[in-house]
């Protein structure tokens, strides 16, 4: 895909190429990304026009993430633009190409290649797709859990006692709305001893590893002995050997294999006093990361759409908190967020356009997340941030996560922390959640003024889009339900509103979602959101799950002129403990499923003019919504997996 040249030339162009050296940064002698950054810093004190960092075609493999601060920003109202050269498709990757394959096991068709010893990764990208880490699916009923781990029956599972590298093995439990990872310590005597604190953290709260609300697939993963299906891989970092069992038709002499080295690619952010600002990225592919957090003894104790529990906590007895307890509420205010591959915080006037975010080992883009999710150490504080005309696809977790989940996100101690004025438009977001299934395409938690419009979302394991967070517990006056749970023993019961207001989902085409998880829908909401608008969206095929889902604490939403086709219940509310819910205006929507528990007059709701459509007889208004939803014609088309693979440089 070629990207158009700008209408007018900028005052100064810094030229970059994958093989660039030196500091000239000229068209004749282009430089590296790092040298280009230094050149910009020598030019941007008093800009009279934009500075363009022009990336030539090819694959850039930086040794470390690109870190942009106030020193790298525009000035005088002008912008520093990092963009593709005309007709170029530059790729910035955190991975290394793996070549030199040879047969390791002829009978099993397992191949191997040398990689640097000590290099670890949770993902491998083969021909532009996320390959499957070696695993075996097991029956939950064959395991009995205790505070130390799991006992299993003998017989067919006896081989587990003899697995090599046992401390690298993980248990994955795909549940209702959480997808959890817990690492093994050792195996012997038909007992799997689990690493702490991951085991405890994964078994307390709700939808837990061993007591899920819905028991989905249960895996043991990351052992060479599990390498038995085409498309699987295993990495031995001690020996520096990568193993792969090719898919049918894959030729290991020509296949593209990318092994991630970096955990993130770009970090844009300064401080609240000196934020990064006036930066644009255009026409660039960002790819090739692997977030290693779940590989530690913390595992990944998934809680809700990319928020997870870590750390050591004073839990009660093992069997006493599988469906919530007071001690779990002590941990809730301290949940963490998955760090994204591209991070923006303490920044304003930042744009990503005409770009691709593919083959990433975590959430693709994090905007104003909590401090712990940013390598800068400064979270939140994102304003006037735009992601447009781009593709986010074929990655391990979610698409775009805007906002934090901790106290400074919803009741900031410094007003400069407020996330505001975020635009996410005309993007195609699809085929996500390869490794972390409890995610969505776009989530705005605590944000003031966001517009998520004209995007296409599809092939998602969980909900399509989500607004809000906190289950109403952090909203003004709090929640009696969470008071009874004991939450306010550990955090304030706030009397003032959160920062969430005036957030809009408009004109999006969301289809083929909820493909693997439960307890979600096409559009999902949590918490209060004054002046929130959900309008003119087209929801199609939710695998029998909800169309519009008002979950706990949802309040002050307006939903009108949306189309819900081939969904389960078209509009539902989870009133469990929901005394602070309602005040919704749900009008003039069309659906093929007439069932709903959202009624007019209840809890201050206005529900009117909604139409159940049969036999495909869509009224003209609904047809107009369906025709206009999704990206405009100027949005670049989605790519196939092979199209994003770059040549070795």
Task: Annotate the PLM regions.
Residues 132, 136-138, 292, 544, ...:
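Extracellular beta-rich repeat passengers
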Residues 1-11:
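Secretory targeting and sorting signals
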Residues 277-288, 324-329, 348-362, 379-397, ...:
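Right-handed parallel beta-helix
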Residues 15-346, 351-358, 372-380, 408-414, ...:
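Extracellular polysaccharide-degrading/modifying enzymes targeting complex plant/algal/animal polysaccharides
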Residues 64-65, 263, 290-296, 339, ...:
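Short glycine/acidic-rich loop motifs that flank beta-strands on beta-rich extracellular proteins
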Residues 12, 49-51, 58, 64, ...:
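The right-handed parallel beta-helix/beta-solenoid scaffold, focusing on the short coil/turn
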Residues 331-343, 366-379, 405-416, 434, ...:
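The substrate-binding groove and active-site-proximal loops of carbohydrate-active enzymes
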Residues 54, 61, 67, 81-83, ...:
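Extracellular beta-strand solenoid repeats
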